[in-house]
């Protein structure tokens, strides 16, 4: 399933560092991040995740970037991805 996440970032430096470290360490089996994008000032991020459930994705994301942002999650239908 695809899960959309909107991040309203309060600490862009902390968010970016935490995200980069988590991606470098490797995501858990069954979860991938095919699309991630941010505004130029990194105040807002929009990601499309693939995972087993909204809960699984939100638990992972909150554990990594929760201290640096307020996050919303939605089950999504996505065109253009396998």
Predicted segments with their positions:
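Short S/T/G/P-rich N-terminal loop/turn motif that feeds into the first structured element of a domain
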Residues: 1-82
């Amino acid at each position: 399933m695809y899960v959309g996440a909107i991040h309203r970032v309060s600490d862009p430096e902390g968010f970016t560092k935490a995200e980069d470290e988590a991606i470098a360490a490797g995501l858990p089996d069954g979860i991938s991040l095919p699309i991630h994008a941010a505004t130029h000032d990194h105040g807002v991020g929009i990601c499309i995740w693939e995972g087993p459930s909204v809960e699984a994705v939100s638990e992972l994301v909150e554990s990594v970037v929760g201290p640096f942002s307020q996050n919303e999650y939605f089950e999504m239908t996505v065109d253009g991805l396998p």
